[in-house]
Amino acid sequence: MTIYVVKAKPKEDLRADLRQELSSGKISSLRPFGEELHHGLENARMFEGYAYWVEEDYCSPPLAMERRSVLDRYFDEITVEQVESDEEGWNRIKDRPMLWKRYTFISPYSCIIYGI
């Protein structure tokens, strides 16, 4: 197993579709990598037009299954940098803004979503 910080340029015209796939649980249901990819994408950070997240992977080349199933559809210019641990990877990107805006609930029956 290897841990990577992933850097990828989102295809902006498909960003809402990716958000929908995350929200529906479609990505997390993919086996064997879905839960890890879902967690990474939900917590991804943005900087200078690129998304960054941490991914644990067993494939060679890295992210082969993830790219084939999800990433190549929604991102361009995908690169990886190996890190020693999950914690090290997230610490490197923690100060960047989140890729996704968070929900603000205003009542038990409604919420405001501040963009994707």
Could you say what each language-model-derived stretch is?
Residues M1-S69, G89-I116:
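Short S/T/G/P-rich N-terminal loop/turn motif that feeds into the first structured element of a domain
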Residues D76-W90:
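Conserved short beta-strand edge segments in small beta-sheet-based binding/regulatory domains
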